[in-house]
Amino acid sequence: MSLELKEKESELPFDEQIINDKWRSKYTPIDAYFKFHRQTVENLESFWESVAKELEWFKPWDKVLDASNPPFYKWFVGGRLNLSYLAVDRHVKTWRKNKLAIEWEGEPVDENGYPTDRRKLTYYDLYREVNRVAYMLKQNFGVKKGDKITLYLPMVPELPITMLAAWRIGAITSVVFSGFSADALAERINDSQSRIVITADGFWRRGRVVRLKEVVDAALEKATGVESVIVLPRLGLKDVPMTEGRDYWWNKLMQGIPPNAYIEPEPVESEHPSFILYTSGTTGKPKGIVHDTGGWAVHVYATMKWVFDIRDDDIFWCTADIGWVTGHSYVVLGPLLMGATEVIYEGAPDYPQPDRWWSIIERYGVTIFYTSPTAIRMFMRYGEEWPRKHDLSTLRIIHSVGEPINPEAWRWAYRVLGNEKVAFGSTWWMTETGGIVISHAPGLYLVPMKPGTNGPPLPGFEVDVVDENGNPAPPGVKGYLVIKKPWPGMLHGIWGDPERYIKTYWSRFPGMFYAGDYAIKDKDGYIWVLGRADEVIKVAGHRLGTYELESALISHPAVAESAVVGVPDAIKGEVPIAFVVLKQGVAPSDELRKELREHVRRTIGPIAEPAQIFFVTKLPKTRSGKIMRRLLKAVATGAPLGDVTTLEDETSVEEAKRAYEEIKAEMART
């Protein structure tokens, strides 16, 4: 079946090319880049071997790639290394010993809006703390290579410190996002078979205390096998329930650890698991994605160089929570692997004012900013005056991650945040890939920018867009995103479920990794990811991606944000409905509602016109910034909301319900 774009289904700027003067010397012709790219995928093993040689290995590999048992590929077989050594030890042997590694900022502020909770850690500080925590885990709890540790912590320095300490020993981490419920936490503890859980008493979120230890206690009523719980007193709460013989205060344990404690880094095999990270599926058991050590390190190292062009004087800020894969790769490992200085922030992006993030960029002189399209669209709604209050001139690179970025959001951020002087890209990758796969690469060769595109595949990644039969889709034709050859950071499987690994990723198109995304490759070879193939509305047999509809709505000057879901229809099978957040100063009206429906009709086609448009002041999002479309669909269909523990603001669902009920009542009266 053809997935060709319908007439005006998408007005993506395929032919628009932007070259700014500040980066002009870095630009290369598109054809020249793809000639180089073709050489890297045709000589895959020698290319990735040359990258791997730039890292320090305790023992070199015997074989670059073992492809004898596809799709269970192994990279740098026989090689031994340690992530903690690469991220910390090797830097303290150089001038970077006293360089700042982490600038951490908590959420609380004083009456003038200045943060009251800040910490600075040099690479030597980090080295000492990682060793002390590793010593504590090994001596007090007998943690050894292969043990699983679940971390249920907020965005505090102890989270990356503990991950590095665990990897130092050879333990396997399972970080669970601190917004997950007790049931979700229990499920992940059971599946990973963790015997230790590390958590905190609580943390700050939008000025409120979020209690964590009680969630762990509730989870352990259902989870089995946990022997010990270590509790970090982040807030110093006095009424935290502690179970004798199982629960231990972090600070009391650390009091007994010598300041010069040292644990020898375990030289683990390249294919040794470093972490398990669970993907949040809409149905069924969460998938425990397993990543190795050597391949992941090489992939993250390469992308830090190519995509972020890291220099010694850079201040790097990735806004992702460490509970997600972006935080693993580009908060914990990536910046520290490069010896960079990074910013970590605990709280909400717009608390107590919508300029919190911009004040952070100004305060620390952030040069590289990695964030989500959802966050950018939220700030668009607040208006330009908030970023204009701050000096953002230090920014030289901005990248987005997590979902496709609409061309309008791209242009806004490029102009308002980057002053049209930054290199700006939209990276594509996923939990399963381990690191960035498609992106502009200002640290390597910068091809002309196009608003909203993900750009070309990075060197060493053979990416394509294929049709229903697995054949390459022609330029401009919508298809499925696949990766045709193995890559170093690829997942090593699903924890304890090899059959599901094969079925989920390798059975749809045999011999190719199926990403589950719709995409278009334009005539220049740029990839435009359109969103999940399962985020599709089928109207009278026509497939419509939610991304295309949302992009059409956001392109209207009155709209700040939108979310589109499909609801059952007796005639068409399914029809799209839209929840729309208007820009400040724009009043909702029936006339505007009609105008927006007509705008979508003109932009995409009659088939895409929303059956209803609901005006809301906020959309339900996770704390990582992703729109929770399933909640909007539940509101519209009357279905149970399900688990809402990751919801940032519960009033957003009530807002959607109110808007929906108002329209229903109005329709009943007419």
Swiss-Prot record:
This is Acetyl-coenzyme A synthetase. It is an enzyme of class 6 (ligase). The modification N6-acetyllysine is found at residue 626. The lineage of its organism: Archaea, Thermoproteota, Thermoprotei, Thermoproteales, Thermoproteaceae. Pfam families: ACAS_N (PF16177), AMP-binding (PF00501), AMP-binding_C (PF13193). Catalyzes the conversion of acetate into acetyl-CoA (AcCoA), an essential intermediate at the junction of anabolic and catabolic pathways. AcsA undergoes a two-step reaction. In the first half reaction, AcsA combines acetate with ATP to form acetyl-adenylate (AcAMP) intermediate. In the second half reaction, it can then transfer the acetyl group from AcAMP to the sulfhydryl group of CoA, forming the product AcCoA. Its EC number is 6.2.1.1. ATP binds at residues 402-404, 426-431, 517, 532, 543. Disulfide bonds: none annotated. One of its GO terms (biological process) is acetyl-CoA biosynthetic process from acetate. Belongs to the ATP-dependent AMP-binding enzyme family. It comes from Pyrobaculum aerophilum (strain ATCC 51768 / DSM 7523 / JCM 9630 / CIP 104966 / NBRC 100827 / IM2). InterPro entries: Ac_CoA_lig (IPR011904), ACAS_N (IPR032387), AMP-bd_C (IPR025110), AMP-bd_C_sf (IPR045851), AMP-binding_CS (IPR020845), AMP-dep_synth/lig_dom (IPR000873), ANL_N_sf (IPR042099). Keywords: Acetylation, ATP-binding, Ligase, Magnesium, Metal-binding, Nucleotide-binding. Acetylated. Deacetylation by the SIR2-homolog deacetylase activates the enzyme. The keyword Magnesium applies.
